Amino acid sequence: GLAALGADIQEKGSRIVCRAKELRGAEVILDFPSVGATENIMMAAVLARGRTSIVGAAREPEIQDLQSFLNQMGAQVRGAGTDTVTVDGVASLSGGDFEIIPDRIVSGTVIVAVAATRGDVTIEGAQPGHLTSLIHVLRRAGIQIDVTNGIMRVSASARPKAVERVVTSPYPAFPTDLQAQVMTLLALADGVSLMKETVFEGRFKHVDELCRMGADIRVDLNNAYIRGVPCLYGSTVEATDLRAGAALVIAGLAAQGRTVVEQVHHIDRGYERIEEMFRRLGGDIVRESNERLIALDAR
């Protein structure tokens, strides 16, 4: 994408070095609707000479928010939210104030945690329209979610039901970034669920850690077969990546006994003091060190 605009890109060891004397508009066709690729090409194209068309662009709300931000600074971007984004380059940008949208994955993580611990929480400030696919899955699992004037009330008083099939896919379908968290919920469900990962390879690293806590999950290529168990048990587990770490925190709050989550730096990449967020909701969780969280049964 950036090379099509005229950038010289070289790999040097663990670094990627990009140089350009001038960027020129071009048609960029993405083989996959990558959020990061779409955003980087959009940002590069706003000051490029001429028009850039991104075909096969990602459609996530963050793309639409970036378009609003860039246009407020003087850019000329249109089409965000569709599969074609068009950018007409401008000579310069100006500063300004901009309020970003709520993080839908953080909101979704909270919703799943409430469901897994059988809580009752009202959530303000999120955007339910960005969470439609998650809400649909959780309602199938028997979780009560009421939305009124943008305010969500999530309540769960019984064991969740299995969901026959959940498939990750680019927005507006079910997000891969909530796959691990929802798998934790389904590990406690009554029945067998199937989670199919179609976005990233190797994104089931949390399965082994959940199984340490008593989950019954079998992985076959990009499919995870989840046979729900009545309860999980506290253990020492490792956050192998950002969303896996969040899932293990949820598991620790839902499990019987004491859970230690290690390698917390992965979680800190996407959640600001996750332990404080869950403590405000009644979770018994503390940060023992920069790399260890300790969670106790929140029920």
Regions found by a protein language model. Name each.
Residues G1-R299:
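Structural preference for solvent-exposed beta-strand-turn elements
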